[in-house]
Amino acid sequence: MGRREHIGDAGIGLIARDGVHALTHLQVDTEAGLPRGSTSYYARTRRDLLALVVNRLSEGSQADINDLEIPASVSRQEAAEIVVGILEHMARRADAQAARGALLFELRDDVELRELLTAEAPVRRPLTRLAERILVAAGVDQASAHAPDLVGLVDALLMYRAAKAAPVNARKVLRAYLEGLG
């Protein structure tokens, strides 16, 4: 891992633990165990630092779904188990999920950076293709039309878990969703 990635990870940890307001160049230097001024070399402004963290979040999310094999045919319940497995894997990066949630609110007026966390996130297309493959394997009609909704549902379940809002039975929710599709 390079220094840029190390700084990004430190920023993610800071945001998850202390909130977006804690994201300063000096705090990232301290969190990363780097000499004072190191973060400023890679990110001159606060917005540059936010962009570095946002990009690091995207990189981690893509790594979560790389190399997943989906069987050619599965039942709806098996499809739900596959999606639960993906959800559980992504939820292991709890700091990343918490930081992403905090940044969504912080960046609501910054269209460019917000898009990298939402609709235009580099991971969004591969994740939607993965959802479509799961839906096709489960025999869902119009799988491509339903894939973005499945991604949105998984995203909501991740956010709910990261926020520790309340216990939700993701398996039950996903089974009901998949059984309800035509």
Q: Which stretches of residues belong to each language-model region?
A:
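N-terminal intrinsically disordered/low-complexity leader segments
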Residues: 1-2
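Solvent-exposed, amphipathic alpha-helical segments
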Residues: 6, 10-18, 64-67, 71, ...
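Short loop-to-helix capping motifs
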Residues: 45, 106-111
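Hydrophobic alpha-helical connector segments
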Residues: 52-55, 65-97, 147-150, 171
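Hydrophobic/aromatic-rich alpha-helical bundle segments in the mid-to-C-terminal region
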Residues: 114-125, 134-182
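Helix-turn-helix
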Residues: 6, 10, 14-48, 52
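Amphipathic alpha-helical packing segments from all-alpha helical-bundle domains
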Residues: 62, 66, 92-101, 111-137, ...
